[in-house]
């Protein structure tokens, strides 16, 4: 397995860990996986830092109920990993049920041999083209 193939496999496993941590509201795992400079750009237009995103899960402002990913492609360019996928999410946000159907770009950055999630850009798929 080449370095790039090994990196792709590692990033895919990290995405699985991140999804499991989101569903379990596993703050310790998310703290480990997320870069301190994380920018999370939601499909709703909101933007979170690592601190705000983790706080939302810790305080149960956001509760993930289901996350389903498919159509995933991972590209690695040096110490940057790009994950492109389709994600369907069922969550509760501030007591309101949400069903999201989004395209997602996740940017992973390797620092000192450790991959951490640096950025997410989520875009809603318009209902008329689903």
Where are these regions (language model features)?
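A beta-strand edge to alpha-helix "cap/lid" segment located at domain peripheries
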Residues: 1-33, 37-130
């Amino acid at each position: 397995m080449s370095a790039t193939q090994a990196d792709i496999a590692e990033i895919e496993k990290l995405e699985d860990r991140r999804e499991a941590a989101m569903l379990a509201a596993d703050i310790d795992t998310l703290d480990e996986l997320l870069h301190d400079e994380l920018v999370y750009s939601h499909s709703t237009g909101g933007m979170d830092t690592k601190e705000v995103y983790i706080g939302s899960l810790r305080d149960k402002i956001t509760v993930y109920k289901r996350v389903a990913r498919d159509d995933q492609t991972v590209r690695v360019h040096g110490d940057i990993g790009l994950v492109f996928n389709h994600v369907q999410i069922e969550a509760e946000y501030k007591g309101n049920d949400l069903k999201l159907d989004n395209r997602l770009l996740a940017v992973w950055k390797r620092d000192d041999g450790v991959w951490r999630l640096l950025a997410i850009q989520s875009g809603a798929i318009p209902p008329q083209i689903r």
